[in-house]
């Protein structure tokens, strides 16, 4: 059975759908903290399972040293990181998301005020 999640940016100008999400995880690196203002909770999805349903023309791209980061040019909402064959889609923009976190990456760089709970595996950098 195909699971479909829908998401929208803050202003509602960009809408998208994600099919068959693979995992929900957190990235605690300083780049994600600067991009979102905190650790990034994201859904991993194959890029062929992500599609815009509205406002693709509003999406702009920032080329960073790690991965291209895509955002709404109207409201500035962080949308997703382009990791090549996969996207890491900002979880906070999705309605009815019911996945449990399955990993924490870059924990060595987490903000000192961020307490990590739960039993999802934690990796100081990236998994081996």
Model-predicted regions and their roles:
Residues 1-8, 13-128:
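A short Gly-Trp-Pro
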């Amino acid at each position: 059975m195909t699971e479909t999640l829908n998401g929208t940016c803050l202003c509602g100008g960009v809408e998208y759908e994600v099919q068959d999400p693979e995992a929900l995880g957190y990235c605690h690196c300083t780049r994600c903290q600067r991009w979102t203002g905190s650790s990034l909770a994201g859904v991993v999805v194959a890029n062929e399972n992500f599609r815009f349903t509205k406002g693709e023309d509003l999406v702009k791209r920032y080329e960073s040293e790690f991965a291209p980061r895509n955002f709404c040019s109207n409201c500035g909402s962080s949308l997703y990181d382009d990791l090549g064959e996969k996207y890491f889609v900002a979880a906070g923009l999705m309605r009815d998301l019911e996945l449990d976190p399955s990993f924490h990456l870059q924990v060595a760089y987490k903000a000192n005020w961020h307490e990590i709970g739960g039993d999802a595996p934690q990796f100081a950098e990236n998994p081996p």
